[in-house]
């Protein structure tokens, strides 16, 4: 963001030119010349308790997702900040809760993407508890609008559309591209077997990005999509796949132009 670079991972200390930053556990900022921590636990250690897997920025707000189960904001324990939290430049805060002081998500966050006030989150979670209301359709991907969580569609039977973990999210306009190791998307009761590892949510429905010509997904091999980036109508996809549909040489990275 500007000249600031935010970094997350499994590190437990940052050494800034000879000065140990013990509060820079798992997340830190580089301003072009020096490292700094994002807050502390009030006792010179970091605010986060475990690894950070993803970071997204909107204005001055930094959204962090990972495996941490708690955030300590200057000595105050935020038990609702499980797996995802927001840093506003001064303080940490949670994104909602389960209505009982715990976090809304029940497992790790691997991907965050932001569009306006909407924060899209993907990961290994199988449920989102929105202030006491269980969102059983919010499996592996969900949206936070600043005040409440919601699911992206369902399987038509109150469960989620995706079958397993989401590792990547990218947004273009109203389209949300989601990648992971899921092998099927169920769009309100309609199975989309060609939506293997990557799919698009247009705000109303899920759809596949092409196919192998036989009704299966375009991406094959020992497959997982780890990264997605969008430029205009082009969608770039990276992962461990060894084939990209009609492009057999598309190992590990491929481009979808909207039709091929």
Predicted regions and their residues:
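Extracytoplasmic surface signature
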Residues: 1-260
């Amino acid at each position: 963001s500007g000249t600031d670079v935010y970094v997350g991972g499994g590190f437990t200390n940052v050494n800034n030119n000879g000065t140990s930053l013990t509060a820079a556990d798992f997340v830190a900022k580089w301003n072009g010349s020096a490292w700094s921590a994002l807050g502390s636990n009030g006792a010179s250690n970091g605010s986060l308790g475990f690894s950070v897997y993803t970071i997204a920025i909107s204005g001055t707000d930094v959204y962090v997702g990972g495996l941490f189960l708690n955030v300590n904001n200057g000595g105050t324990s935020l038990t609702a900040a499980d797996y995802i939290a927001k840093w506003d430049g001064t303080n940490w805060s949670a994104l909602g809760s389960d209505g009982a002081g715990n976090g809304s998500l029940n497992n790790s966050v691997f991907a965050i993407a932001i569009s306006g006030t909407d924060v899209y989150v993907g990961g290994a979670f199988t449920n989102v508890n929105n202030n006491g209301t269980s969102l059983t359709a919010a499996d592996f991907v969900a949206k936070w609008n600043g005040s409440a969580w919601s699911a992206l569609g369902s399987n038509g039977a109150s469960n989620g559309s995706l079958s397993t973990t989401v590792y990547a999210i990218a947004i273009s306009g109203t389209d949300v591209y989601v990648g992971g190791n899921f092998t099927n998307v169920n769009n309100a009761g309609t199975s989309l077997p060609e939506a293997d590892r990557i799919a698009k949510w247009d705000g109303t429905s899920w759809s596949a990005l092409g196919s192998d010509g036989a009704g299966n997904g375009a991406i094959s091999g020992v497959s997982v999509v780890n990264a997605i980036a969008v430029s205009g109508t082009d969608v770039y996809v990276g992962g461990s796949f060894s084939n990209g549909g009609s492009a057999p040489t598309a190992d590990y990275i491929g481009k979808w132009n909207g039709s091929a």
